[in-house]
Design a protein with these regions (language model features):
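Catalytic-core regions of glycoside hydrolase
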Residues: 1-114
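Catalytic domains of carbohydrate-active enzymes that cleave complex glycans
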Residues: 1-25, 114-277
């Protein structure tokens, strides 16, 4: 695709091309794609810092992150901590990621789940109302993405392909014609709390940008205290097998801590006009 764009003699030659892949193999495997998006859970710190710095320094390329995985960042899962998406923009700012791409927002039809989407009556006698074919009743079913194969005696309901709760769903149908019993009769979507938490984190970053203009050192100290390690800063347990780390996320899960950090940023911005919160 990148080659076709590059060879286009008309306006199409100016199109951007985007792919989700690791920055570590970018130069060799994807030399012509100009936007790269990556999912990360852990990463070798030095290698990732070098690779992302090279991408950010290239005027013809841009580097994004997408979705989210612990412990590198907060996630979009409904069973993550409430502050997860508030943390995400802080980690994004700290590590210099220009944009965060999220897939999807209204994935109410689990067409990627494959044939292994069970009839939930095997788990719950009332489960027939949880889905209709691949359509998910998002007001009844926590599971929204991936296969839905079996019930594990230890971890419970799960699947072999990317079983997840809330993934792909940031908003809910105000009017539901597939499951009319769940319809709220609202002309438009219903925002999730996760979307609101994400918005709050984005607002925090705007305060960070303003505070940086007043006192960069104090502002950076707040960032470091709230997100000691983000993205590839988390490192790996074994450099010979850089796929895991025995370490929880570094940030506080107490929402009061995040409100206090915002108050500190505001007082940096206000300077002599600082107020007590």
């Amino acid at each position: 695709m990148s080659r076709f764009v590059a060879e286009n003699p008309g306006p199409g030659g100016d199109l951007d091309t985007f792919i989700t892949a690791s920055p570590l193999e970018y130069d060799t495997d994807l030399p012509s794609t100009n936007i790269l998006g990556t999912v990360i859970s852990v990463g070798q710190t030095a290698r990732w810092e070098e690779a992302t710095a090279a991408l950010n320094a290239d005027p013809d390329r841009r580097y994004f992150m997408y979705n989210g995985r612990r412990p590198a960042s907060g996630t979009f899962a409904t069973d993550d901590d409430g502050v997860a998406l508030r943390e995400l923009p802080w980690g994004q700012f700290k590590t210099g990621i220009s944009r965060w791409y999220y897939w999807n927002s209204n994935y109410w039809n689990n067409f990627l789940g494959g044939p292994a989407v069970r009839d939930l009556t095997q788990v719950d006698p009332q489960g027939a109302s949880y889905r209709l074919g691949t359509h998910t009743n998002v007001f009844k079913s926590a599971h929204t993405f991936g296969s839905h194969d079996f019930f594990d005696p230890i971890i419970g309901e799960t699947g072999v392909f990317n079983y997840s709760n809330g993934d792909g769903v940031l908003m809910y149908p105000g009017t539901d014609r597939v499951f009319p019993a769940e319809s709220r009769g609202i002309d438009g979507p219903i925002a999730s709390l996760r979307m609101k938490h994400w918005r709050r984190g984005i607002q925090d970053v705007k305060y960070i940008e303003l505070a940086m203009q007043v006192n960069a050192a104090a502002t950076q100290a707040i960032i470091n205290s709230m997100v000691p390690k983000a993205m590839w800063e988390i490192g790996v347990a074994d450099e010979n097998d850089p796929t895991f780390v025995h370490e929880p996320p570094s940030w506080s899960t107490d929402p009061d801590d995040w409100e206090a950090a915002r108050a500190q940023l505001i007082n940096i911005i206000l300077g002599s006009n600082a107020v007590a919160f």
